[in-house]
Curated annotation (Swiss-Prot):
The modification N-acetylvaline is found at V2. GO terms for molecular function: ATP-dependent protein binding; protein heterodimerization activity; small protein activating enzyme binding; SUMO activating enzyme activity. This is SUMO-activating enzyme subunit 1. It is found in: Nucleus. The modification N6-acetyllysine is found at K202. One of its GO terms (cellular component) is nucleoplasm. The heterodimer acts as an E1 ligase for SUMO1, SUMO2, SUMO3, and probably SUMO4. It mediates ATP-dependent activation of SUMO proteins followed by formation of a thioester bond between a SUMO protein and a conserved active site cysteine residue on UBA2/SAE2. The gene is Sae1. It holds the Pfam family ThiF. Pathway: Protein modification; protein sumoylation. Broadly expressed, with highest levels in testis. The modification Phosphoserine is found at S16. The modification N-acetylmethionine is found at M1. GO terms for biological process: positive regulation of protein sumoylation; protein sumoylation.
Amino acid sequence: MVEKEEAGGGGGGGISEEEAAQYDRQIRLWGLEAQKRLRASRVLIVGMKGLGAEIAKNLILAGVKGLTMLDHEQVSPEDPGAQFLIQTGSVGRNRAEASLERAQNLNPMVDVKVDTEDVEKKPESFFTKFDAVCLTCCSRDVIIKVDQICHRNSIKFFTGDVFGYHGYTFANLGEHEFVEEKTKVAKVSQGVEDGPEAKRAKLDSSETTMVKKKVLFCPVKEALEVDWSGEKAKAALKRTAPDYFLLQVLLKFRTDKGRDPTSESYKEDAELLLQIRNDVFDSLGISPDLLPDDFVRYCFSEMAPVCAVVGGILAQEIVKALSQRDPPHNNFFFFDGMKGSGIVECLGPQ
């Protein structure tokens, strides 16, 4: 159903004729009010590797008001393999600065900025300038710290990463309200449902109604520290995606080594991953069999196709949260590139 609303050019939060033409497709898809909310939103993306570039591209094209790309690291020789915003010959430059020109060219109406400081050194006041914060390439401690800051200040929080064939996203939207478009169902008179086809009630796809809903999210710390000792948790263990436990292993590797597994040190890193898997699973009180040894073959480096999928999902969730349109993923999304499928998992306090 296309909402028949006029794009006002003056005050009252309207958008200009130029913006209405630029975002005509989005307005037809999710409505003028949702687009207005996007045009009033500022987003921070931390980590401008392959996944960060995909998220930035999608949000800039969607038409947020402003987007800040924060990264204190330099471009490595491997980065251009998945990071398409970086131009040739940029090795050694700051990753965010090297991404600015192509990012801004995607949509001149969006205010794209860069920040070259380390996110760990940013004060709480820095994050309050944004409506949504999305972390990539960050340590577990930084993820938890920034999530707590966002939670205190009612800022939409997202995080995600890509490890080889695997990727994940997580959202903490606090107490989130949204509207969902539902198709109206015509009332059926008693006995009519068994009558001739012509007399049966039909679903009119052009007749819809907007339903307001509310959902509550938990902090990332609680989602990562599930107690698997309870009977209810044990029953859910077999149904939980193995990628949740893979994430625990990879975040521990990142904390211990200060980097992600690399193909240059495959043998050493593979052995360390197996050891970390055993240690993490032992601390959780669960069997290592939940994550077979061959997982080490599929979690090295960023793969461009996986970045595209996970970045598309993560950007879509940010758009949904900012526009308050459609149900969000609560709270994890895991993508397995070997299977070519993804799953949404709600993990946290039982």
